[in-house]
Amino acid sequence: MKRSRTQYAEETEENDDFNPVYPFDPFDTSDVPFVTPPFTSSNGLQEKPPGVLALNYKDPIVTENGTLTLKLGDGIKLNAQGQLTASNNINVLEPLTNTSQGLKLSWSAPLAVKASALTLNTRAPLTTTDESLALITAPPITVESSRLGLATIAPLSLDGGGNLGLNLSAPLDVSNNNLHLTTETPLVVNSSGALSVATADPISVRNNALTLPTADPLMVSSDGLGISVTSPITVINGSLALSTTAPLNSTGSTLSLSVANPLTISQDTLTVSTGNGLQVSGSQLVTRIGDGLTFDNGVMKVNVAGGMRTSGGRIILDVNYPFDASNNLSLRRGLGLIYNQSTNWNLTTDISTEKGLMFSGNQIALNAGQGLTFNNGQLRVKLGAGLIFDSNNNIALGSSSNTPYDPLTLWTTPDPPPNCSLIQELDAKLTLCLTKNGSIVNGIVSLVGVKGNLLNIQSTTTTVGVHLVFDEQGRLITSTPTALVPQASWGYRQGQSVSTNTVTNGLGFMPNVSAYPRPNASEAKSQMVSLTYLQGDTSKPITMKVAFNGITSLNGYSLTFMWSGLSNYINQPFSTPSCSFSYITQE
């Protein structure tokens, strides 16, 4: 049921798009109960949006002001009768032109117009077949898969890029885009581009043929190149051969020489094998001679000298005493010399060790007993307290015989003889004085080398040390490691010597074991270190260290004196100035 648009004239402007076609709702069709009008058709009609009947059309048909019309392009218009017409002012591009009679097409050869149709004039190999432009081909040009092709046979070929190429093999190749012939001597390409043979003497080219001029013994015959031979050269089975007689012989292709001793072949050279006494010198076989032999006018003789001479074909030895050569060479011996069978009959000294003699190393020495000593290489009498040498060098009672000994001083005397064995026997002189002052001992010490390495410091002698070891009563132990020898002077001071009173209790002179625990070499307070100078020279500093109870046994005591820093004074004598030290006593 249609409704008049006017009955809704009083509606507000927002309802101006009211659709008078059922279901009348212009705003929201999602809730419209779709009831399709019975007059819709898919031929030119459509329901869009739902519930609304509309025309279904496409360009050039459009609506304009609610009316169907057409989109008109350039050159098209509607006349007064509503008919489509073409205007005369159509814009065209070449080859078209707009004339009063209509559109005109301009063309040029090979295009033409025949029977009011545009056509194409052709000339072989082009043609038109079945209204198509075609190409007339003949081998080797072909048409394959609508493409021009080229049929090839070897050595021509086409590569993957469609390029025509030439298959080559040696000696042909391509150089600089030109076909090139590779040659090896003697073939060459001459300046004219022709292939020729390079020749060198004796080969040459004559009458366009290779020829070989020959000289004796070569010759050219109808059979070919040959050689003229004479004895001992022959030709056997087409090969040169050599006729030989002993000692020459040929084996296979080798000429050899048969040899027998003493001839040999060494390094492809014939040589003479020589035995003892013979040698080859230059090109001569000569006699080899050693020391004592010579040649005199081509005769080998004995060359003698130094007490030897020849007489009657014999060598004679002339000797003087103590030698004897009357039979075998021997040595005349005097008293005290014998041959020692146990040492391969070496000559040795025959001494009586019971009469005060002894061996010291390889030397005969005096075996000094008690009361005797050595000083500066001399045997001397050891004088005790109260004894002196008078003006006649006789032993006499000294004025100090009534001098009491000092129980507060232990010493070695102020200038003792060598009394220490450090590197070798009796090689040093130790001067030591210990004076007790209440609970303190003040000491003076010096050490002087008298022989061996201590007179000539070696690179291995970097430190010199002296050990004095005492037992639990403070008595000096004269065995190792004590450096003082058993016969050294040591005891209470009496005048300038040592008292005959034996030290039975020296604890008042011993380092305190509470202050210097034993052993204690690593504890700083158990050491006394001072700077001194080698030989008293202030340009030669060395270090002296005194260690207290450093190497002692369980119940004993010790004093150790060490001088270090000697490596800077190689080959110089070792001697130290007097140095003082102090320590706390045991009692």
Swiss-Prot record:
Question: Where is region (Disordered) located?
Answer: 1-23
What switches on expression, per the entry, is described as: Expressed in the late phase of the viral replicative cycle.
Outcome (variant: P418E): Loss of interaction with CXADR
User: GO CC terms on record?
Assistant: host cell nucleus; viral capsid
Coarsely, its chief localization is virion
Q: Which GO terms describe its biological process?
A: adhesion receptor-mediated virion attachment to host cell; cell adhesion; symbiont entry into host cell
Arranged from A to Z, the UniProt key words for this protein are: Capsid protein, Host nucleus, Host-virus interaction, Late protein, Viral attachment to host adhesion receptor, Viral attachment to host cell, Virion, Virus entry into host cell
| SUPFAM superfamilies for the chain | Fibre shaft of virus attachment proteins, Virus attachment protein globular domain
According to the UniProt record, what happens if one changes P417E?
A: Loss of interaction with CXADR
Assembly: Homotrimer. Interacts with host receptor CXCAR. Interacts (via N-terminal tail region) with pentons.
The record's function comment reads:
Forms spikes that protrude from each vertex of the icosahedral capsid. Interacts with host receptor CXCAR to provide virion initial attachment to target cell. Fiber proteins are shed during virus entry, when virus is still at the cell surface.
Remarks, anything else? Answer: All late proteins expressed from the major late promoter are produced by alternative splicing and alternative polyadenylation of the same gene giving rise to non-overlapping ORFs. A leader sequence is present in the N-terminus of all these mRNAs and is recognized by the viral shutoff protein to provide expression although conventional translation via ribosome scanning from the cap has been shut off in the host cell.
Specify the protein name: Fiber protein
